[in-house]
From Swiss-Prot:
One of its GO terms (biological process) is homeostasis of number of cells. Disulfide bonds join C99-C114, C113-C124, C148-C193, C192-C201, C224-C270, C269-C277, C289-C303, C302-C314, C385-C394, C417-C463, C462-C473, C486-C502, C501-C512, C539-C584, C583-C592. It is found in: Secreted. The keyword Protease does not apply. This is Alpha-fetoprotein. Cu(2+) binds at H22. Belongs to the ALB/AFP/VDB family. Residues 1-18 form the signal peptide. The gene is AFP. One of its GO terms (molecular function) is metal ion binding. It holds the Pfam family Serum_albumin. The keyword Disulfide bond applies. Plasma. Synthesized by the fetal liver and yolk sac.
Length: 610
């Protein structure tokens, strides 16, 4: 079984271009050649991934049958002269296999998609993908005795079944990434099956795979959503930023060449074209190593590794290369005497791409969204100064103001870490909980708790880093968390404020949410006593269970009075804590809550005017 890594591609975000053109808008040639195809393709695994991701509810038996059927079709189509990996219109062939099955379309609600053709059919299937379908339970690794026996009896079948289980639960996860994770799992099984404590061995060694699986799945979905929602120009800027930070010695033309090809790979991976996604991933990783002398001095040891899997992982974790000597510290008067407003659209895009490249290679520790905000601010500055009496003087003054984007992000990181140091992770989450219940009161309590728990956990992790790394850590994590919130809004609209922040500007999404205070359109529901009834289980609960109960009370309180002030909130919390202390110390806890609880709520309603 051939395993190929693609995590390297996760780092190299990109913009969408058609591969058949083999050059981007600036005439830069592609390193990918669509006339080439790989004979070394494990089509069983790739077809399994495709069908499991596009028909998530299908059983393994059903997926296995579709795999067998489509391989027969492919062999007939390509003949003996060409490898199966050369099949054209691969996605169409795979989708046709789903639709021509007698029971599959009707059983799984696919008839509407199957009634369409071409791109419409493909887009219909893509829109059906669900990140966490309720009908599919979380994956549980079988207990060691069963796993080890099944693995020993038929390793290929065991691993294909594992790939099926992962793919159907993570429909946005790139095919090469699934194969990479399966390769890691394949390696831990033999030693763990021989271990004295097999259960502990599997739990310990599978933990890192599970973590990488979860993070990669979220990241792949995030990238595909950004590509779809914000388009080519934004994705190009993201890619140029990341590549320029990773390879600061590479010239602009080389960066643009990589942008084009990594872009195509992401496009194919996001659209579920598993064969081309995998083939092109190999080529880009190989190309990076072939150009290591001009790209980076940090990947030499990586490129000596024997397998693509090891090579790719090594490059991912390699440090950003050192900045070239003689690089000027700033980009004053970057355009020189040229009038920005007189440039064509193509020239403007090229100028901004080059500015982003130059700025990124000078600031390897800044988060991508921060650099994009600087670039956006710089373009606005150029447009404004082109209309002034003294454009160059205007630029000189304005370029100093670009630091405000970095300073705003630094101030937020400092403020958040200050809160963490003062309050700890739980109370930091409560602060986020109050803020985001006001911003998005339409979210359910479990959604609000899950969202803010991620924020608090991220804050704790980032704040333990050195000060120069806190900013990139926090901004990067916030981008992903907000991205998940925006996916939720796309599926089920939350409110106009959230919608505005999610769709207006990728670079400014986080600042937009930071400045969003209240949903002015929200009307609190009529007061319900049922949401504020206290029982003795508050005294019996401990740890996470008790914290969850308290947070539920906090959410209900803020939803009832979104305009609640910090002073009012502190007073209510103090009264609530007093109630717990009084009733939990007594013998008749339930009686105490029944008597004192309503009194507390009456006092709270009077003070808040609800």
């Amino acid at each position: 079984m051939k395993w190929v890594v693609s995590i390297f591609l996760i780092v190299l975000l990109n913009f969408t271009e058609s591969r058949t053109m083999h050059e981007n808008a600036y005439g830069i040639a592609s390193i990918l050649d669509s006339s080439q195809c790989s004979a070394e393709m494990n089509l069983v695994d790739l077809a399994t991934i495709f069908f499991a991701q596009f028909v998530q509810e299908a059983t393994y038996k059903e997926v296995n049958q579709m795999v067998k059927d489509v391989l027969t079709v492919i062999e007939k189509s390509t003949g003996s002269e060409q490898p199966a990996g050369c099949l054209e219109n691969q996605v169409s062939v795979f989708l046709e296999e789903i639709c021509h099955e007698e029971e599959i379309p009707e059983k799984y609600g696919l008839s509407h998609c199957c009634s369409q053709s071409g791109e419409e059919r493909h887009n219909c299937f893509l829109a059906r993908k669900k990140a966490a379908p309720a009908s599919i339970p979380p994956f549980q690794v079988p207990e060691p005795v069963t796993s080890c026996k099944a693995y020993e009896e038929n390793r290929e079948l065991f691993m294909t079944r594992y790939i099926y289980e992962i793919a159907r639960r993570h429909p946005f996860l790139y095919a090469p990434t699934i194969l990479s994770l399966a390769a890691q799992y394949d390696k831990i099984i033999p030693p763990c099956c021989k271990a004295e404590n097999a259960v502990e061995c599997f739990q310990t060694k599978a933990a890192s795979i599970t973590k990488e699986l979860r993070e990669s799945s979220l990241l792949n979905q995030h990238m595909c959503t950004v590509m779809r929602q914000f388009g080519a120009r934004t994705f190009r800027a993201i890619t140029v930023t990341k590549l320029s930070q990773k390879f600061p010695k590479a010239n602009f033309t080389e960066i643009q060449k990589l942008v084009l090809d990594v872009a195509h790979i992401h496009e194919e991976c996001c659209r579920g074209n598993v064969l081309e996604c995998l083939q092109d991933a190999e080529r880009v990783v190989s190309y990076v190593c072939s150009q290591q002398d001009t790209l980076s001095s940090k990947i030499a040891e990586c490129c000596k590794l024997p397998t693509t899997l090891e090579l790719g992982q090594c490059i991912i974790h390699a440090e950003n290369d050192d900045k070239p000597e003689g690089l000027s510290p700033n980009l004053n008067r970057f355009l020189g005497e040229r009038d920005f407003n007189q440039l064509s659209s193509r020239e403007k895009d090229l100028s901004m791409a080059r500015f982003t490249y130059e700025y990124s290679r000078r600031h390897p520790k800044l988060a991508v969204p921060v650099i994009l905000r600087v670039a956006k601010g710089y373009q606005e500055l150029l447009e404004k100064c082109s209309q002034s009496e003294n454009p160059l003087e205007c630029q000189d003054k304005g370029e100093e103001e670009l630091e405000k984007y970095i300073q705003e992000s630094q101030a937020l990181a400092k403020r958040s870490c200050g809160l963490f140091q003062k309050l700890g992770e739980y109370y930091l989450q409560n602060a986020f909980l109050v803020a985001y219940t006001k911003k998005a009161p339409q979210l359910t309590p479990p959604e609000l708790m899950a969202l803010t728990r991620k924020m608090a956990t991220t804050g704790a992790a980032c704040c333990h880093l050195s000060e120069d790394r806190q900013l990139a850590c926090g901004e990067g994590a916030a981008d992903l968390i907000i991205g998940q919130l925006c996916i939720r809004h796309e599926e089920m609209p939350i409110n106009p404020g959230v919608g505005q922040c999610c769709t207006s500007s990728y670079a400014n999404r986080r600042p937009c949410f930071s400045s969003l205070v209240l949903d002015e359109t929200y009307v609190p529901p009529p007061f319900s006593d049922d949401k504020f009834i206290f029982h003795k289980d508050l005294c019996q609960a401990q740890g996470v269970a008790l914290q969850t109960m308290k947070q539920q009370f906090l959410i209900n309180l803020v939803k009832q009075k979104p305009q609640i002030t910090e002073e009012q909130l502190e007073a209510v919390i103090a009264d609530f804590s007093g109630l717990l202390e009084k009733c939990c110390q007594g013998q008749e806890q339930e009686v105490c809550f029944a008597e004192e609880g309503p009194a507390l709520i009456s006092k709270t309603r009077a003070s808040l005017g609800v």
